[in-house]
Amino acid sequence: TLDIVPGVMEHKNAKIQIFDIPGIITGASSGKGRGREILSVARTADLIVVVLDTLNPQHINVILDELHNIGIRPNQQQPDVTVKPKKLGGVNISSTVPLTHLDEKTIRSIINEYGMHNADVLFRDDVTIDQFIDVLDRNKSYVPMIVLLNKVDLVDKADLEELKKYIPE
């Protein structure tokens, strides 16, 4: 497939729109091979289905890296963190869960990097630094993903077990 090919299927009176997109290559997120155009379709998807060749399972790493680089977080929940900018009062940090990856100094430093000097920050999830930065960027898509293995008839059972390590949870 060299172009995005749309299709519609009907299931239980629901019309489901499907886009078959070209294979994702290294550098797609930076525009190589019309990659940004192709990956932008995935940003708005309700589900990403990756068809993975069992003879080249390492390709999943390229796909995951390129999706991450363009701001798609497959099979991740959006962090439950609220940042409300305000006019005065400095940065107020509160949390309903223990924060094991962030401390107050790091949070304030990251907030300041984004030019916010007055904000209320509420953590309802224990997030990493990268997840907190994703919250502040506000341009990430959290999309469920399914990985399908293609050509399973060409590998034996032992190899199928080995393939499981390539498939993300």
Feature-to-residue mapping (PLM):
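Internal, well-ordered alpha/beta segment that forms a basic, Gly-enriched binding/recognition surface
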Residues: 48, 54-56, 74, 78-81
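Switch II of P-loop NTPase G domains
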Residues: 3-7, 11-16, 21-49, 55-66, ...
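A short, gly/pro- and small-residue-rich
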Residues: 64-74
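Solvent-exposed, non-transmembrane amphipathic alpha-helical segments
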Residues: 41, 58, 69, 80-87
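Structural motif
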Residues: 53-54, 151-152
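Short, conserved loop/helix-junction motifs that constitute active-site signature segments
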Residues: 139-140
